[in-house]
UniProtKB/Swiss-Prot annotation:
PANTHER family referenced in this protein's UniProt entry, alphabetically: 5-OXOPROLINASE SUBUNIT A, UNCHARACTERIZED PROTEIN YBGL-RELATED
InterPro entries: Glyco_hydro/deAcase_b/a-brl (IPR011330), LamB/YcsF/PxpA-like (IPR005501)
Record flagged with keyword Nucleotide-binding: yes
Family: Belongs to the LamB/PxpA family.
Domain of life: Bacteria
EC number, UniProt record: 3.5.2.9
Gene from which this protein is expressed: pxpA
Protein's recorded name: 5-oxoprolinase subunit A
Reaction(s) the record says it catalyses: 5-oxo-L-proline + ATP + 2 H2O = L-glutamate + ADP + phosphate + H(+)
This protein's record includes keyword ATP-binding: yes
Keywords: ATP-binding, Hydrolase, Nucleotide-binding
């Protein structure tokens, strides 16, 4: 049977501030990118998120990012690569400990926001991420954009590189994501998102902002949990894939 992994960013609440409906998202996705406290999340939120993921049978991954709570980790940070590597190790270690208290373990790593976008082409930061992951557990896959520098370096280092696509994001013709600062960068219509995902999963292709078709091979598809209507989009995506005979299953 053909299958696809659906992942979502979760655990991004902080203290009395709540973001997204993680409990509802867990009913549709197979993998959870859990914030590790640097761009969002706190120890209580992280542990609760791990508990709910375990209860829902959803795989846990470390959603690591820049140390940038006020910017939600979406801004580029010009950080020394060795310091970035230490920050990544710190975040993965924190999630590993909190996941263990709920009888779970971290199964993969996905960089977040500004860091995710930077390491598409920023070799020094991409290498810092790869070195950090390898120093902790060389069996941890790294999730990233197809053709990115971080996935190239991960493969070269003997790590598993997992390509992902985004259900609710618009693409440039070169395969990069349209900047969130531009109109139309984030898709909000569940039907449009479902069609977008079906093209990715069934045809290994996406329609870019200029109307051209780009070939893309993705092992996982991300549905952002903090977008307006995120739960409805996740439900629509899962239903569309199921109707097309595509099973939803974690990639690891």
């Amino acid at each position: 049977m053909v299958y696809m992994d659906l992942n979502s960013d979760v655990g991004e609440s902080f203290g009395r501030w709540t973001l997204g409906d993680d409990t509802a998202m867990f009913q549709s996705v197979s993998s959870a990118n859990v914030a590790c406290g640097f761009h969002a999340g706190d120890p209580t939120v992280i542990r609760r998120t791990c508990r709910e993921a375990v209860q829902a049978g959803v795989m846990i991954g470390a959603h690591v990012g820049y140390r940038d709570l006020s910017g939600f980790g979406r801004r580029f940070v010009d950080i020394d690569p060795s310091e970035l590597a230490d920050d990544i190790v710190y975040q993965i270690g924190a999630l590993q400990a909190l996941a263990a208290t709920e009888g779970a373990r971290v199964r993969y790593v996905k960089p977040h926001g500004g860091l995710y976008n930077a390491i598409v082409s920023h070799t020094a930061q991409a290498r810092a991420v790869v070195d950090a992951v390898k120093s902790i557990d060389a069996s941890l896959p790294i999730l990233g954009l197809p053709g990115s520098e971080v996935l190239r370096l991960a493969e070269a280092a003997g790590l598993r590189a997992v390509s992902e696509a985004f259900a609710d994001r618009a693409y440039n013709p070169d395969g990069t994501l349209v900047s969130r600062s531009l109109p139309g960068a984030v898709l909000h219509d569940p039907a449009q998102v479902a069609e977008h995902v079906l093209r990715m999963a069934a045809d290994s292709a996406i329609r870019t902002v200029d109307g051209s078709i780009l070939r893309i091979n993705a092992d996982s598809i991300c549905v952002h949990g903090d977008s307006p209507g995120a739960v409805a989009m996740a439900v629509a995506v899962r239903a569309a894939l199921s109707d097309a005979g595509i099973d939803i299953r974690a990639f690891a």
